[in-house]
């Protein structure tokens, strides 16, 4: 068995973004005021919803998502 066969398939950034957006939409409803940043890190996909207006109070959700299963490992809401 080759190494490639042993590795689990990784989710694409689009798939991960869909998971994060579904959860964020339930919590925040209007996501238009956020810029979304996504990066693959050693502990999973990091998806951050940051306010476009730096002077506004509050913030958006922040996620770490498992790259294989798409499960939200951690989430933090700033409101």
Describe the function of each predicted region.
Residues 1-79:
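Long, terminal "pre-/pro-" and other extracytoplasmic accessory regions
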């Amino acid at each position: 068995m080759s190494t490639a066969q042993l590795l689990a398939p990784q989710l694409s950034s689009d798939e991960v973004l869909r998971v994060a957006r579904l959860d964020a939409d339930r919590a925040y409803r209007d996501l238009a005021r956020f810029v979304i940043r996504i990066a693959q890190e050693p502990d999973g996909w990091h998806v951050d919803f940051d306010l476009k207006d730096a002077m506004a109070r509050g913030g958006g959700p922040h996620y770490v998502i498992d790259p294989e299963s798409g499960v939200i490992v951690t989430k933090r809401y700033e409101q």
